Curated annotation (Swiss-Prot):
UniProt comment concerning the protein's domains: Consists of three domains; the N-terminal catalytic domain, the editing domain and the C-terminal C-Ala domain. The editing domain removes incorrectly charged amino acids, while the C-Ala domain, along with tRNA(Ala), serves as a bridge to cooperatively bring together the editing and aminoacylation centers thus stimulating deacylation of misacylated tRNAs.
Chain residues that bind Zn(2+): 563, 567, 664, 668
Cofactor: Zn(2+)
Enzyme class at the top of the EC tree: ligase
Name of the protein: Alanine--tRNA ligase
Key word tRNA-binding present: yes
Catalytic activity: tRNA(Ala) + L-alanine + ATP = L-alanyl-tRNA(Ala) + AMP + diphosphate
Keyword line: Aminoacyl-tRNA synthetase, ATP-binding, Cytoplasm, Ligase, Metal-binding, Nucleotide-binding, Protein biosynthesis, RNA-binding, tRNA-binding, Zinc
A GO BP entry: alanyl-tRNA aminoacylation
PROSITE patterns assigned to the protein according to its UniProt record, in alphabetical order: AA_TRNA_LIGASE_II_ALA
Compartments where found: Cytoplasm
Cofactor descriptive note: Binds 1 zinc ion per subunit.
Domain of life according to the entry: Bacteria
Length: 874
């Protein structure tokens, strides 16, 4: 069966069982800020399962578009190198909302697999939750699966309900056991059945998961039976297609083979097994569907994930020899494959192609220069044996040449090199504000505008009617913007806050009679003229059009919480650290507040706790916020805090929030209680006498605390102790490690001595010099040196090469006794060997070290040492 036939057969089967066929939801989750992208079939039914949404049906089936790239679920780096990792995939599913339950779900699954898809029953193995006797009995007694092929899977050690066969929506809420169906590819494939030590092999592949939501977990962890149990199932189309088409890799199915051939055509590649072609076949699906669902390449959020995927695809095309835009040429092939099932691909083909072409043209301007720098750096590293790529250089590639970090890491990984991501993050943090100023703000400031000012209504409302006063594209005024075009819109009235005072600009939409403009940022073109930056997602927008301007409520509210929390934190910092504390810079956005301030020492843990206590006490007090506009001299008399060096007008806005009083034009909560919660996330130094605090407020703070609690719980579970005993257990373990390392060093020294005695007998006499070349299994550099010294003492007049292999790395040591260095140099000898194993080294005349990356050539290299010495002695 072809992939399209499999998809349709699945939907038709469940339609015949009374299920409503529901179209795939968008890859951009509607109303769920916890998700970056739709990544499961149940996402669109989440509120139905939770009881918040009622549908006219109780049975549903769908083929859901899913993306896993960025955030918690991120398969990007594995795509192209494994048989089953994808950024985009389709999830086939059937769902019961309080209708049928385990018996029908299991019978449906078995009937579809064995009677419709005609899979041999003896090729299927199933798992159930260890305590789910009901599912076990259905499989063994009703379906007739032999007991040895129905495997009970229990909890992970130390964690109740933490099992591959127990599903939970979150820490609380609907949950329940699941049963998974696996296909056995046969004994010729390595791997064991699920639950066995070899379960990670490729022999048994999960093809279908049936989740039985039968409990509601409360905050104390108690399970309460649901009055109407439900069913949520998921089967990857690509996986079942591989099984039905008799291939082992998803990339061998018809759908991918056609896309791989298309990728080969547009890159003029003849090797159809190239991993890079698989990358292109995968990435064209993710990119095209994301653009079809309204995601535009950008520098933040979903837009940046899309840009990363596009640029990773371009890099793989470049690796195949492409030197000009090619990726967009694959869109038509994708539409041919999937356009009937997903009409949005057909209707959006021209727009998708255009946006991809724009991104390609932009990146091809810099990729060659960037790759040259990257390759040169890697070549230098190979010479020195360094295996960690400089994070500052990685940031330069990102900042100057548009190389996402994972693209650089992808190239490095192919050479056995990792990237110093901590140094990259530090460089990013230092330059982020400068990049913002050099990018969006500079672009706004350079626009020429001579019309009327913008009236801001955003203190009182998040929606307003406005008239388009001006439009800009590529920095120039235009009469209209068309679908897919980036631009700037100026309105006479707006609820959108323009970036100022450290607070980022608002996002949202401008809806006209003929078009919708997605506002990605709002910047001031002039003091009282606001530019709405973004893209026209549909239709046309013209100068003079009336629009409905609507700010993204969730984003604005989060920003307001962070801004108000910043004022309270500033006041608390002065109370705890002293009146010398002055603001040196700030950034307030939906995800955090970042606050730079004058202070000469790191803020201690106790001081951080006291600052948090003060702010959270103000939040609990739930006092109203008061904003007043008054003459600046009157504001000074009230004691309002003013920022040193800031320019103020004759009239200023004074904000009272809690015990804080500052001049501020930003947007804020109505009462301190609206902030919800405050938590300091990090504290660091950014310059002499300047410290930086990053903090979170509201739901962002809550998520941070939950993540920290989960990390603590995971660590405690790993050590098999309650969380309260974790610190003591770690200290105990560190002491044990220290003792074991000491014992290991002693044993290595002893081993070196014994190996030296054994190896000495293998030396051959060449021209009066004893020559030895041998491998020491598992030896590190110190062990090689110690063994070398003992051999030199024992052999007296000698030239020695010792090597070891650890993973894909080769370590080589060359030693020459003092009486021989006039004729043979250790550095020359070690480089002779290292060159054959893909490395280079150096050292003193009597001792030198080297590294290599090709262990397969080591035996030949060692065998050639005697001949090299003989040639040197002639």
């Amino acid at each position: 069966m072809k992939s399209n036939q499999i998809r349709q057969a699945f939907l038709d089967y469940f339609a015949s069982k009374g299920h409503q066929i529901v179209s795939s939801s968008s890859l951009v989750p509607a109303g769920d800020p916890t998700l970056l992208f739709t990544n499961a079939g149940m996402n669109q039914f989440k509120d139905v399962f939770l009881g918040f949404d009622k549908r006219p049906y109780t049975r549903a089936t769908s083929s859901q578009k899913c993306v896993r790239a960025g955030g918690k679920h991120n398969d990007l780096e594995n795509v192209g190198y494994t048989a089953r990792h994808h950024t985009f995939f389709e999830m086939l599913g059937n769902f019961s909302f309080g209708d049928y339950f385990k018996r029908d779900a299991i019978h449906y699954a078995w009937e579809l697999l064995t009677q419709v898809f005609k899979l041999p029953a003896d090729k299927l193995t199933v798992t159930v939750y260890a305590e789910d006797d009901e599912a076990y009995d259905i499989w063994t007694r009703e379906i007739g699966v032999p007991a040895e092929r129905v495997i009970r899977i229990g909890d992970n050690k130390g964690a109740r309900y933490a099992s591959d066969n127990f599903w939970m929506m979150g820490d609380t809420g609907p949950c329940g056991p699941c049963t998974e169906i696996f296909y056995d590819h046969g004994e010729h494939i390595p791997g064991g059945p699920p639950g066995s030590p070899d379960e990670d092999g490729d022999r048994f592949i999960e093809i279908w998961n049936n989740v039985f939501m039968q409990f509601n977990r409360d905050e104390q962890g108690v399970m309460h039976p649901l009055p109407k149990p439900s069913v949520d199932t998921g089967m990857g189309l690509e996986r079942i297609a591989a099984v039905l088409q008799g291939v082992h890799s998803n990339y061998e199915i018809d759908l991918f083979q056609n896309l791989i051939k298309a990728a080969a055509r547009v890159t003029n590649t003849t090797d159809l097994d190239s991993p890079s072609l698989k990358v292109l076949a995968d990435h064209i699906r993710a990119c095209s569907f994301l653009i079809a669902d309204g995601v535009i390449p950008g520098n933040e959020g979903r837009g940046y994930v899309l840009r990363r995927i596009i640029r990773r695809a371009i890099r793989h095309g470049y690796k195949l020899g492409a030197r000009q835009a090619f990726f967009h040429l694959m869109v038509s092939a994708l539409v041919n494959e999937m356009g009937d099932a997903y009409p949005e691909l057909k209707s959006g083909e021209e727009r998708i192609t255009s946006i991809l072409r724009q991104e390609e043209d932009r990146f091809f301007e810099t990729i060659e220069h960037g790759m040259a720098i990257l390759e040169a750096e890697l070549e230098e590293m190979a010479k020195t044996g360094n295996h960690v790529f400089n994070g500052e250089t990685a940031f330069k590639l990102h900042d100057t040449f548009g190389f996402p970090l994972d693209l650089t890491a992808d190239v490095c990984r192919e050479r056995g090199v990792s990237v110093d991501s901590a140094a990259f993050d530090a460089a990013m943090a230092r330059q982020k504000e400068q990049a913002r100023a050099a990018g969006k703000f500079k672009m706004a400031a350079n626009l020429e505008y001579t019309g009327n000012a913008t009236t801001f209504h955003g203190y009182d409302t998040l929606e307003a009617q406005g008239k388009v006063l001006a439009l800009y594209k590529d920095g120039s005024a235009v009469p209209a913007l068309n679908e897919g075009e980036l631009g700037v819109v100026v309105l006479d009235n707006t609820p959108f806050y323009a970036e100022s005072g450290g607070q980022v600009g608002d996002q949202g939409i401008l809806k006209g009679a003929e078009g919708i403009f997605q506002v990605e940022d709002t910047q001031k073109i002039q003091a009282s003229v606001f530019g709405h930056h973004g893209v026209l997602s549909t239709g046309t927008l013209r100068v003079g059009d009336e629009v409905s301007a609507r700010v993204d409520l969730l984003s604005r509210h989060r920003t307001m919480r962070h801004h108000s929390a910043t004022h309270l934190m500033h006041k608390a910092l002065r109370a705890v650290l002293g009146s010398h504390v002055q603001q040196k810079g700030s950034l307030v956005d939906p995800d955090k507040t970042r606050f730079d301030f004058s202070h000469n020492a790191p803020v201690t843990a106790d001081e951080i706790r006291r600052i948090e206590d003060i702010v959270n006490a103000e939040i609990l007090a739930n006092t109203p916020t008061l904003a007043r506009v008054m003459p600046i001299d009157e504001a000074q008399k009230t004691g309002a805090m003013m920022l040193f060096g800031e320019k103020y007008g004759d009239e200023v806005r004074v904000l009272d929030i809690g015990t804080s009083r500052e001049l501020c034009g930003g947007t804020h909560v109505s009462r301190t209680g609206d902030i919800g919660l405050f938590k300091i996330v990090s504290e660091s130094g950014v310059a002499a006498g300047v410290r930086r605090i990053e903090a979170a407020a509201g739901d962002v703070a809550l998520r941070h605390i939950q993540q920290q609690q989960q990390l603590l719980a995971d660590a405690a579970a790993s050590f098999k102790v309650p969380a309260i005993e974790l610190a003591g257990k770690i200290s105990q373990t560190l002491e044990q490690i220290k003792a074991l390392e000491k014992e290991l060093a002693r044993l290595k020294s002893k081993l070196a001595s014994s190996q030296g005695d054994e190896l000495a007998s293998q030396a051959v006499n060449i021209g009066g010099i004893k020559v030895l070349a041998a491998t020491l299994e598992g030896a590190d550099a110190n062990t090689l040196r110690e063994t070398m010294d003992k051999l030199k003492d024992k052999l007296k007049t000698a030239a020695i090469v010792l090597a070891s292999v650890n993973g894909d790395k080769v370590s080589v040591a060359a030693g020459v006794t003092t009486d021989t260095t006039a004729r043979i140099k250790a550095g020359e000898l070690v480089n002779f060997v290292a060159a054959q194993v893909g490395g280079k080294g150096g050292g003193k005349p009597d001792m030198a070290m080297a590294g290599g990356s090709d262990p397969s050539q080591l035996p030949r290299a060692l065998a050639s040492v005697a001949g090299w010495v003989e040639e040197r002695l002639k």
